[in-house]
Structures are given as C-alpha cells and as structure tokens.
C-alpha cells in the first residue's frame, strides 16, 4: 500500500494523454488499443480514488503544492474521457460522468484561483501546468459534442478567452524567470490549451469564424515547434514524473491537426489540408514514442525494477 500512497500525481495527466492517443488509434481502425487503454485508465482512476480515501492527508499535502494541485485537474479529465467510453454502452451513465466531472473541474478552478491568484501569488510556481486546470475542462467539449450537453458552448468561449488572457503572461514568465529543473517539462503543456481550443471550437460551435480558427491553429503550430526544438533538452533529463508534461499536449495536438485538416477541406483548401494531415501523421509517430516511454518508466517506478 506504500506504493499506492507514493503514486505520483503526474500519472493522471499521463493517462489523459494515453486515452487521447488511443482515440486517435481507434480512428485509424485499431479499436483494441482504445479498449485496452480505457480499461487501464479505469484501474488507475480507481486506485487513485483509493489513495484519496486511504491517504487523504498525503493528497491534501499534494493539493497544497501549486504544481501538483494544477495537475489534479487531470483526475476530472480522465473521468470525462471514460464517460465518453461508457456513453457508448449506457448513454445516461456516460453523460452523468461527464457532467459530474465538469462540475468537479469547475470547483477545482475556483479553489485553485483563490489559493494561487487571489490569496497569494508566486511567479516561480506560475507554470504552463496551470493550463491543465484552466483549460482542461474543455476535454468535455472534445468528447461530449454528441451528448446533447447544452453548456458546452459556454465552456468553449471560456476556454478561448482564458487562453488568450494567460498565454502572453506565461510567455513573459518563461522568458524572464528561470524555470527550475523539477518543473522543466511542464513547459510542453503550452501546446495543450490552444489545441483544446481548436478541437472544442470546431466540435461545438456551428457558425465558425475562420479567422479565429486560423489564429488558434497558428498558436498550435508555434507551440508544437517550441516542443520539437526543446525535445533534446527534455530528454537530456533522467526520467522523473515531470515527463508527464509531454504526454497529453502532444496527443491533443494530433487531434487538433486532424480537425484542422477537416476544416480546411471543407473550406476548399485541399492542398493545405493534405499537408496538415501529413503533419498529424508525424505528430502521431512522435507522440507514440513519448507516451510509450513515459508509461514504461512509470511501470518501472511502480514495480521498483532496478535500473542497470
């Protein structure tokens, strides 16, 4: 049970990334990958619930720490994605899971804002992992567009606004304030919010503003380029739970490119759409390696396998 108490918070966002990637593979026809990942994530979620109940004091301590606290939002994101899976077998239960997860996430946003913005502020803990809290709620728009949940459009507009509010301040912070090694990999999270905005907007909003879509996808491309340039430095570190910062952003980036390719095709820009589709293929190739690497290393940590 000690291993359960020590289960790192970043396992949660790692599985959000793995679940998202499994949906990509399912779209390619590899449905078993999706089923296996969904069941594995369900086990991890149950284990984390046990940790919350049995080791409440440990979890409260983690929640008081700004960076882990921002990542706790991934708990709700896992529930949302699992809800979309359950929805296929039981629409009422699946939809309820998504709605409950959104409510929990909204409460988390309020708590996080009070503790880390209103009550006190620390530029050293102001990192891209904050986007997991503030934009992670948009996962509901990624997976729930066909569930008939009326409030999703409000989440889309909230997510886009909060992204444009935070990202310039975040860029300033990354340029002007030293990033500590312990949180270095959270820089990769900058790809997640803009990708979520693209996917959510194209999924939920009927009358789309093409200029807004292009601007958001330009942010995706810039963020992706930033991560690709940083990859050698990211992997220069010995593995630690912070590597989870690379997982979901890269996975949702694939979905954003696929959605953008569809949008461009509908706009009559087949040539550019084909290029974006090929980019999505490259993203899938790189992301599979990254998520596989992180998952394998978490297994090694969990089983206490001695490294040679």
Task: Tell where the protein language model's regions lie, with residue ranges.
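N-terminal signal-anchor module of multipass membrane proteins
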Residues: 1-49
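Juxtamembrane helix-loop boundaries in multi-pass membrane proteins
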Residues: 1-20, 56-83, 98, 114-142, ...
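Helix-coil boundary and interhelical linker segments in multi-pass alpha-helical membrane proteins
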Residues: 23-32, 84-95, 142-154, 201-212, ...
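C-terminal functional regions that serve as terminal interaction/effector modules
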Residues: 26, 45-47, 220-227, 246-308
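Structural signature of hydrophobic alpha-helical transmembrane segments
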Residues: 33-46, 91-106, 150-165, 211-222, ...
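Generic multipass alpha-helical transmembrane bundles of integral membrane proteins
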Residues: 100, 130-224, 229
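Membrane-water interface at the C-terminal end of transmembrane alpha helices
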Residues: 110-119, 143, 172-173, 227-229, ...
């Amino acid at each position: 049970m000690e291993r359960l108490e020590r289960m790192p918070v970043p396992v949660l966002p790692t599985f959000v990334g793995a679940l998202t990637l499994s949906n990509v593979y399912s779209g390619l026809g590899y449905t078993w990958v999706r089923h296996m990942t969904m069941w594995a994530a369900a086990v991890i979620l149950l284990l984390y619930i046990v940790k919350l109940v049995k080791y409440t004091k440990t979890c409260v301590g983690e929640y008081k720490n700004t960076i882990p606290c921002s990542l706790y939002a991934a708990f709700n994101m896992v529930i949302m994605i699992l809800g979309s899976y359950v929805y296929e077998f039981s629409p009422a239960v699946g939809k309820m899971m998504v709605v409950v997860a959104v409510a929990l996430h909204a409460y988390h946003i309020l708590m996080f804002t009070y503790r880390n913005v209103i009550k006190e502020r620390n530029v050293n803990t102001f990192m891209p992992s904050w986007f997991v809290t503030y934009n992670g709620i948009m996962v509901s728009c990624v997976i729930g567009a066909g569930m008939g949940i009326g409030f999703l459009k409000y989440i889309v507009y909230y997510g886009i606004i909060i992204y444009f509010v935070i990202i310039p301040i975040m860029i300033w912070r990354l340029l002007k304030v030293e990033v500590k090694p312990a949180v270095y990999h959270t820089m990769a999270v900058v790809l997640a919010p803009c990708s979520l905005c693209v996917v959510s907007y194209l999924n939920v909003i009927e009358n789309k503003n093409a200029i807004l879509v292009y601007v958001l996808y330009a942010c995706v491309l810039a963020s992706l380029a930033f991560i690709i340039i940083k990859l050698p430095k990211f992997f220069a570190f010995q593995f630690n739970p912070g590597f989870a910062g690379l997982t979901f952003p890269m996975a949702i980036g694939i979905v954003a490119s696929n959605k953008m390719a569809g949008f461009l095709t509908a706009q009559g820009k087949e040539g550019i759409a084909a290029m974006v589709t090929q980019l999505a293929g490259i993203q899938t190739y790189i992301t599979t390696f990254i998520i596989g690497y992180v998952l394998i290393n978490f297994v090694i940590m969990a089983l206490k396998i001695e490294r040679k």
